[in-house]
Amino acid sequence: MSEINFDPVNLTQSLVKCASVTPKDEGALTVVANHLNAIGCDCHPLTFSGNNSYEVKNLFATIGNEGKHFAYAGHTDVVPVGNESSWKYPPFSARIDAGKLYGRGSEDMKS
């Protein structure tokens, strides 16, 4: 496995900027795949039927073929924004103010 240096704040900002409101992906899985590919993962996009009414994009990634198996499940989608005027900053701006990152998903699986 390769080592890679990356900025976790930059990664979080990249993900928050993706307006991935369920069931839309809006590029979030591409951001994840690019980072996983950089450390040697093989990434495979998958599409499932969500409740037979919409498609749900997923990403299956593997690295190596020896040792014990480890599985990690996460998500990059967020619930709808609601009243955008209630937000201090636009919900997908990934704005940093006074050392805090603001945006949809910044305190969930996007961080």
Predicted features along the sequence, with ranges:
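Acidic/His- and Gly-rich active-site-bordering loop/insert found
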Residues: 2-107
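Short, intrinsically disordered, charge-balanced linker/junction segments flanking boundaries
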Residues: 109-111
